[in-house]
Amino acid sequence: MSNNHYDVIIIGTGAGGGTLAHHLAPSGKKILVLERGSFLPREKANWDTVEVFQKDRYHTSEVWYDRDSEPIHPGTGYWVGGNTKVYGGALFRWRERDFEKVVHQGGVSPEWPLKYRDFEPYYTEAEKLYEVHGTRGEDVTEPYTNNPYPFAAITHEPRIQEIHEALENKGLHPFHLPLAIKLNEVNRRLSTCIRCDTCDGFPCLVDGKADADLNCMRPAADNWNNVSLLTEAQVLQRFSNE
């Protein structure tokens, strides 16, 4: 048991915890980041469809239970970087109406005390941090911003481009996904991403995704002496003197 004092303790290293650690690292505060998992191994199985989807190699085997005590298999993984290690890299901004009261089939999502306008500058920062590629103005549902995406949209594969154009000819509005991947289409020799067909749902063997591990936790822990990362540290309970 450590008796060290920390100014900030962050539980989890996914999109929330990892991003927070990266943002606070330059503050000089003494920061401890606790992660119940370890670093996801780079191995041939990263791109093995059977291992990834049939054997659930990178998902926890634990079972959760809903309010009716029915079992749930969460399909989540415990790694440095959290579930961003296996996401497809699509990073959308919430729409303005998402912060309002929204009536769903199963209930009501209450109105937020903060609105999209409060988050807009932080969305812009996050898109830079996660190297998001996209084109403003294509998505007719996107919320307002005066800032372009940090990188140009990823070009479509030929067949997808044909479908894109066919939909446009029908008066529809297809758009390029905002993708957080380390792809350099100007100079492919400098590109980490190789544009393979094992992305969404797979770990990336070549570290081509802009995830919370590569873009946040490793820079924070490696470059700032005030940030400590403790892996395989599951938090079961939090005590407070308040």
What do the PLM-derived regions correspond to, one by one?
Residues M1-E125:
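N-terminal glycine-rich phosphate/pyrophosphate-binding loop and immediately adjacent elements
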Residues G12, E232-V235:
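Glycine-rich anion-binding loop/nest that anchors nucleotide
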Residues T19-H22, N215-R218, Q234-L236:
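Generic recognition of flexible, low-complexity loop/linker segments
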Residues V103-E232:
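Conserved redox-cofactor binding core of oxidoreductases
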Residues Q237-E242:
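Conserved beta-strand-loop-beta-strand element in the redox core of flavoprotein oxidoreductases
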